[in-house]
Amino acid sequence: FLRN
């Protein structure tokens, strides 16, 4: 979720 950090980069999505």
From Swiss-Prot:
<dbReference type="GO" id="GO:0007218">
    <property type="term" value="P:neuropeptide signaling pathway"/>
</dbReference>
<dbReference type="GO" id="GO:0005576">
    <property type="term" value="C:extracellular region"/>
</dbReference>
<feature type="modified residue" description="3-phenyllactic acid">
    <location>
        <position position="1"/>
    </location>
</feature>
<keyword id="KW-0527">Neuropeptide</keyword>
<protein>
    <recommendedName>
        <fullName>Antho-RNamide</fullName>
    </recommendedName>
</protein>
<keyword id="KW-0027">Amidation</keyword>
<keyword id="KW-0964">Secreted</keyword>
<feature type="modified residue" description="Asparagine amide">
    <location>
        <position position="4"/>
    </location>
</feature>
